[in-house]
């Protein structure tokens, strides 16, 4: 929306603490406003984080080396905003929405003061108008459409337009760049406004027009432990806390590859640059199993790595969720992966310390919980004006020091999310992938998913709970056996322990390097879980613990082989038939 620019203020630096500057200004300034600081004739982007009388404190998003007293500061009159429109998919941005591939053309390193438009003028889009002259529209109403990959990108009345407007001119169908004016309108006061394919929105304000509805669709991710034991709904929230080396990033990469959603927003917030490079190298060559096209066609990457300024970590998190909310308004299912929210919290702690605020637990700011809650609450499912449903599922990785789940960031996250996938260093060291510990993890969506799947598989919810009980009992018996040995437990307990190990080894674990087992579709999960449930219900009588262990090891080996065979192939049916015959033979001979 094109409007008259607001009056801006100016000021001068009077004090500096790292990337935090104290500025005395003349004019009008508001909290969250974008400012530009002149350092060695380079304008550095900053954000107002505290206003007190005629002084403000601004956090600069880039290196402030060379900043001095008296340096000129200008205020834009705008909040920190995201540029939204066609062309964001397949994009690679930093936390301030600069296109990194464009910056890379100028230099191998990120030069401070460089700002690039997120949506290029060079790309042309086939615009089809939908609204007509004389139509009365409000924010979020459809102006036209352009194709973006396999999606129909809806060009909507900007969400910053809060008044009802009447269209006075509409561009004809054709090929234009994103910044071309495609419609003009007049509001009730007679004020003229023009609309392009691009709109801007403050990243720290929730972006929604429509009605929030309860999440009710299952999100299939191809990991048996998540889909069965710790399910997540589209529009839900979940977290993946774990110590260093437990596999948080690997798990998030799996979700970005195989989750049954339309668009994935990958936010690398403070993680190592090498992990981002891995994504950039792999994703263009990987095929989306749901569409058969490159994964990059549905992916947007925001990479603010640990080597970038601390202040930009916060903006990268909010930028990612704003882009996700924008695509949700088109009736699409979005998955936002934030890796890691702990780095964001550490940035908050650093800024809070420089502001001399009263610290909370472990020196984190007292408002940490409310900030984390506000972030996760931006997820959810909605019904848009045209009746379509969109969803935003948020997954946040948490990196507690030493794997301590009692620290403030993890506890604040657990209070608001719908599912908790706790990663275990012990399971990771034992090469149990994914290293999610089923004994400490939980999902508030378990009963709801059970009710949905009851229509497909009778007794699904009860069977899943029974499997979880086997795991708990098996873990208790295993700990007892470590103390007293196998001779100290009854044969019945030994059988429960071996069944729990079988379930863990053959169902909950998957081979990430196997082209078949790395992704398990839901139909295959149902069939395999039915086989495991049959083993749970079977009664065996063994002469000795060695006989029991030998039988279950053979069974494990055969089921593991089955997991690596193409689903419903001839080899698959033959292998499954061998397992069924072995079960029936053992039950007949020993029962």
From Swiss-Prot:
The keyword Cytoplasm does not apply. ATP binds at residues 242-249. The gene is atpA. Keywords: ATP synthesis, ATP-binding, Hydrogen ion transport, Ion transport, Nucleotide-binding, Translocase, Transport. PROSITE patterns: ATPASE_ALPHA_BETA. GO terms for molecular function: ATP binding; proton-transporting ATP synthase activity, rotational mechanism; proton-transporting ATPase activity, rotational mechanism. Transmembrane segments: none annotated. Produces ATP from ADP in the presence of a proton gradient across the membrane. The V-type alpha chain is a catalytic subunit. SUPFAM superfamilies: C-terminal domain of alpha and beta subunits of F1 ATP synthase, P-loop containing nucleoside triphosphate hydrolases. The keyword Translocase applies. PANTHER family: H(+)-TRANSPORTING TWO-SECTOR ATPASE, V-TYPE PROTON ATPASE CATALYTIC SUBUNIT A. It comes from the Bacteria. This is V-type ATP synthase alpha chain. Coiled coil: none annotated. Its EC number is 7.1.2.2. One of its GO terms (biological process) is proton motive force-driven plasma membrane ATP synthesis. Belongs to the ATPase alpha/beta chains family. It catalyses: ATP + H2O + 4 H(+)(in) = ADP + phosphate + 5 H(+)(out).
């Amino acid at each position: 929306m094109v409007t008259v620019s607001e009056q801006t203020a100016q000021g001068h630096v009077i004090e500096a603490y790292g990337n935090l500057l104290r500025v005395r200004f003349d004019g009008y300034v508001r909290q969250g406003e974008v400012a530009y600081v002149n350092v060695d004739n380079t304008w550095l982007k900053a954000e107002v984080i505290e206003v007190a009388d005629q002084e403000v404190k601004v956090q600069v998003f880039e290196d402030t080396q060379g900043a001095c007293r008296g340096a000129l500061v200008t205020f834009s009159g705008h909040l920190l905003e995201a540029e939204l429109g066609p062309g964001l998919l397949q994009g690679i941005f930093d936390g301030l929405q600069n296109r990194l591939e464009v910056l890379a053309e100028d230099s191998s390193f990120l030069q401070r003061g460089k700002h690039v438009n997120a949506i290029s003028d060079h790309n042309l889009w086939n615009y089809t108008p939908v609204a007509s002259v004389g139509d009365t529209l409000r924010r979020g109403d459809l102006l036209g459409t352009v194709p973006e990959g396999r999606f129909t990108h809806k060009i909507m009345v900007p969400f910053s337009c809060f008044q009802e407007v009447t269209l006075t001119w509409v561009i004809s169908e054709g090929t234009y760049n994103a910044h071309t004016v495609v419609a003009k309108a007049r509001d009730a006061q007679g004020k003229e406004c023009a609309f392009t394919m691009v709109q801007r929105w403050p990243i720290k304000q929730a972006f929604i027009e429509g009605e929030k509805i309860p999440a009710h669709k299952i999100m299939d991710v191809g990991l048996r432990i998540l889909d069965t034991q710790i399910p997540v709904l589209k529009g839900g929230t979940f977290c993946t806390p774990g110590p260093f080396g437990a596999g948080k990033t690997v798990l998030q990469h799996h979700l970005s590859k195989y989750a049954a959603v339309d668009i994935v927003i990958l936010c690398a917030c403070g993680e190592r640059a090498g992990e981002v490079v891995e994504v950039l190298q792999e994703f263009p060559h990987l095929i989306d199993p749901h569409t058969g096209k490159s994964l990059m066609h549905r992916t947007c990457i925001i990479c603010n790595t640990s080597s970038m300024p601390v202040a930009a970590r916060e903006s990268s998190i909010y930028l990612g969720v704003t882009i996700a909310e924008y695509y949700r308004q088109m009736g699409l299912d979005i998955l936002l992966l934030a890796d890691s929210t702990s780095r964001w919290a550490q940035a908050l702690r650093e800024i809070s310390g420089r502001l001399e605020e009263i610290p909370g637990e472990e020196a984190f700011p007292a408002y940490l919980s409310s900030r984390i809650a506000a972030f996760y609450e931006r997820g959810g499912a909605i019904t848009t004006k045209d009746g379509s449903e969109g969803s935003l599922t948020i997954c946040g990785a948490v990196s507690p020091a030493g794997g301590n789940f009692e620290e403030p960031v993890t506890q604040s996250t657990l209070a608001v999310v719908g599912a908790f996938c706790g990663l275990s260093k012990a399971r990771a060291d034992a090469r149990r992938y994914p290293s999610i510990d089923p004994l400490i993890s939980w999902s508030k969506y378990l009963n709801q998913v059970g009710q949905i799947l009851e229509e497909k598989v009778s007794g699904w919810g009860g069977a899943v709970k029974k499997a979880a009980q086997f795991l708990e009992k098996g873990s208790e018996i295993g700990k007892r056996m470590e103390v007293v040995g196998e001779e100290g437990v009854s044969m019945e307990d030994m059988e429960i322990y071996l069944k729990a190990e079988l379930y863990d080894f053959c169902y909950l674990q998957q081979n990430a390097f196997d082209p078949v087992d790395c992704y398990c579709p839901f139909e295959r999960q149902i069939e395999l879980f039915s086989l495991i449930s049959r083993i749970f219900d079977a009664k065996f009588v063994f002469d000795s613990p060695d006989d029991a262990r030998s039988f279950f090891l053979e069974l494990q080996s055969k089921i593991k082989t089955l997991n690596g065979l193409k689903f419903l192939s001839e080899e698959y049916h033959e292998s499954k038939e061998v397992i069924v015959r072995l079960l029936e033979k053992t039950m007949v001979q020993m029962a």
